[in-house]
Amino acid sequence: MNKKLELMYGSLLHDIGKIVYRSNSVDFAKGTHSKIGSQFLNKFKPFQLSGIVDSVSYHHYKELASSSLLDDSVAYITYIADNIASGTDRRASEGDYEGEGNRQRFDKRAPLASIFNVVNSETKGLANYTYSFEKEQVYRYPTDAKKEYTSSQYAALVNKMTDDLSNKLKVGPDSFSSLLQWTESLWSYIPSSTDTNQVMDVSLYDHSKITCAIASCIYDYLTEMNCVNYRKELFSPYEKTKQFYQEDVFLLVSLDMSGIQDFIYNISGSKALKSLRSRSFYLETMLESLVDDLLSDLELSRANLLYTGGGHAYLLLPNTERARDVLASFEGEMKEWFIKIFKTDLSVAIAYKACTGEDLMNSNGTYSDLWQTVSRKLSDKKAHKYSLNEIKLFNSTIHAGTQECKECLRSDIDISEDSLCKICEGIIAISNDLRDYSFFVVSPEGKVPLPRNRYLSVENQDGAERKIKMNKETRIYSKNQPFVGKQLVTNLWMCDYDFSTLNPETKKQGIASYVNREVGIPRLGVLRADIDNLGTTFIKGIPEQYRSISRTATLSRQLSMFFKFELSNILKGARISVIYSGGDDLFLIGAWDDVISKALVLRKAFTRFSAGKLTFSAGIGMYPVKYPISKMASETGVLEDLAKRGEKNQVALWNDSKVFGWSQLEEQILKEKMIPLQEALTNSQEHGKSFLYKMLELLRNEDQINIARLAYLLARSSLSEELTQSIFAWSQNKQQKVELITAIEYLVYQIREAD
């Protein structure tokens, strides 16, 4: 095996001994987690390679300084990478490792803390939320209850790891992605450090993954410099170590795919509602495939991928001439492909900034500036999308068609006999497969186009395995099902909740089935939402002393898991389909009342998830089923923008006159006003919709005479005196009057006969 691959394995597994140490296993000698880790890993023959074992044994200064390793040992690279990922050079720290002899400083029972404890703490204070140790649960909420991780829990994890390392995991270029997936599945809620002098909010998975990414970059950087004496360059004398931290070894890279929302929503054909989710999944998978193409060109792994979602990706790459050339070539190739396939509907842009180890550790206070610079450079790229040659290419590929696609309305592309372009035809073709199958296959044969003469198809597991055997270039993604397999690139967490597919009667009709009801207005509810001030949170939300690349990776992964995995659990049972759920924004369509009720549940879950440190704003519209989806999207987007004005943390409901705080909607409108009215009407034989309509008419009319008329209407009603007095008092207050009108409208929509 080549040295770089051994380094990737070793740097990813360098802290495996921490889990074994915390298990109190009698099978291993006492000592540091490094020593215990190497003893544990040596049990498994495929992993007994010097680059792997040395990275586990000697990734701390004291052990490395006293070792007799060769000058070209990759353990020196793992040591530097571990320091950068940890956010500090730990050379001067006494007892800087977990193990025997440091029991007072390290608490092996300590749970993983929530990253949100420190997020926005300068404005909202520090929190003390931690996660429980539950091996089988993919997603967990932090709580403020006191917790301890027990040695028996760690022992069970060691047994699981032993079984997998013995029987499932392999060592080789086609198997590394499986190991990376394995560490995510098992280590995401294990604290990287149990040092009581530190904040324990970075998981062992996030730390190990970032260490691997940094190590891979350093290896490529030194290789291009023809440097093979890693000890001299990185370790001894120490002045060389400090100098290396100051070198521009890395590139922070941002990749952006623009035009996503217009591509998804700007359709108007008879199958528009049915193909919405398919269009979203297509673009999401396309972005993942783009990232893997780029990483493959660079001979790097998904460890170097910091984040994907919402049409964006961030990567950590080596600052080498080769990497910069690959980025330029890749961007040009992708832009050309997008122009040929999508014209200007979709486009791609890449920006990057060279950075040092000190930048990534924030030891010089430049970490936030690094991200801001990359963001600014990307904005400049997007503002000047096309070069002269690319504009010429666009003009040369214009197709003067006589027909337009009945779904996307494009006329610059060949149209089939069914009046569909090839892209819409393929997207519609995979719609049913998306509901039933969980494997996305990227291969030379398929239904919708991807770059480099490949196509996307959706298969069951047997179908995916057959395609692998037919073509070794096949790439497979599993959806919400982590697997360990040779060519399985990665599991993609995707929120695929779609209530309409759960019942054979509604499956064929899809989203349109949500207007089928016996009572209540037959309308679709549309929600668009995104997190408030997320960009600021990423750049400045983590206080200066805690900023590091590992915490940024932790924060982005937690947000991604909430919206791509946990959201399905939150929506369970609701008549809703998730059209789009990225790392920070959301688009739902469903029965109008389910959309509102679940929006309130989602807001509470998000508050719980983020320890109250983050909020989101939303627009909620209500539409007839045949209303153009493009207008639903744009109009609800306007409502979302209204909700994000001022203090944010709001919802704009139905129109621009109804912008409420979330608590205001739930407590003052629904609980305080709507529910008492609903109960009163349920218990009364005299009052129904006509009574509500009359009240609405009087409340909406600003004439003074209507105050007396409202008082008269209430006095003659059979409502309780307490409720009539409350209604009249609410009508005299401007804000409460709007709340009352909204409550009555909500109730009318609930009880009116279906069309």
From Swiss-Prot:
InterPro entries, sorted: Cas10-Cmr2_palm2 (IPR054767), Cas10/Csm1 (IPR013408), Cas10/Csm1_subtype-III-A (IPR052117), Cmr2-like_C (IPR048693), Csm1_B (IPR041062), GGDEF_dom (IPR000160), Rev_trsase/Diguanyl_cyclase (IPR043128)
Keywords: Antiviral defense, ATP-binding, Endonuclease, Exonuclease, Hydrolase, Nuclease, Nucleotide-binding, RNA-binding, Transferase
EC number in record: 3.1.-.-, 2.7.7.-
Metal-binding is among the record's keywords: no
Essential cofactor(s): Mg(2+)
Domain GGDEF: from-to ranges: 522-656
Gene Ontology biological-process entries: defense response to virus
Note accompanying the cofactor annotation: Synthesis of cA6 requires Mg(2+).
One of the Pfam families matching this protein, by short name: Cas10-Cmr2_palm2
Transmembrane feature ranges: none
Free-text activity regulation comment from the record: Synthesis of cA6 is inhibited by EDTA.
Region feature (HD domain): 1-87
Domain comment (free text): The N-terminal HD domain has ssDNase activity. The C-terminal GGDEF domain has the cOA synthesis activity.
UniProt xrefs under PANTHER family: CRISPR SYSTEM SINGLE-STRAND-SPECIFIC DEOXYRIBONUCLEASE CAS10/CSM1 (SUBTYPE III-A), CRISPR SYSTEM SINGLE-STRAND-SPECIFIC DEOXYRIBONUCLEASE CAS10_CSM1 (SUBTYPE III-A)
Family membership noted in the UniProt record: Belongs to the CRISPR-associated Cas10/Csm1 family.
Note: Encoded in a type III-A CRISPR locus.
Protein name: CRISPR system single-strand-specific deoxyribonuclease Cas10/Csm1 (subtype III-A)
